[in-house]
Swiss-Prot record:
Subunit structure: Part of the 50S ribosomal subunit. Contacts protein L29.
MF annotations from Gene Ontology: rRNA binding; structural constituent of ribosome
Cellular component, GO, one term: ribonucleoprotein complex
BP GO annotations: translation
Name of this chain's protein: Large ribosomal subunit protein uL23
Family listed: Belongs to the universal ribosomal protein uL23 family.
Role description: Binds to 23S rRNA. One of the proteins that surrounds the polypeptide exit tunnel on the outside of the ribosome.
Residues making up the signal peptide according to the UniProt record: none
The keyword RNA-binding appears for this protein: yes
Keywords, ordered alphabetically: Ribonucleoprotein, Ribosomal protein, RNA-binding, rRNA-binding
Recorded coiled-coil stretches: none
Source domain of life: Archaea
The species this protein was found in: Picrophilus torridus (strain ATCC 700027 / DSM 9790 / JCM 10055 / NBRC 100828 / KAW 2/3)
Gene: rpl23
PROSITE patterns reported for this sequence: RIBOSOMAL_L23
Length: 82
């Protein structure tokens, strides 16, 4: 099942991508941390170090921290963010 709905692109998330190697996604409300980790690793061929989740007004957000060997900016480029 596809849990990732779309990347969230704001000034704050772009700074997190550049400085902290994190990508923020809007995800399905039933998604778990493990499911998001597996989907990101499979879809983008990267290694995920950590997943933080929060429920906001507009849905559930997942902040994915990539392993140091991988670049969040490169993944963002592949998604069409940059």
């Amino acid at each position: 099942m596809d849990y990732i709905i779309s990347p969230i692109v704001t000034e704050k998330t772009t700074l997190m991508m550049e400085k902290e190697n994190k990508i923020t996604f809007l995800v399905n409300r039933k998604a778990t941390k493990e499911a998001i980790k597996n989907e990101v690793e499979a879809r983008f061929n990267v290694k995920v170090a950590k997943v933080n989740m929060m429920i906001a007004k507009n849905g559930k957000k997942a902040i994915v921290t990539l392993a140091k060997d991988f670049s969040a900016e490169e993944v963002g480029g592949r998604m069409g963010i940059f």
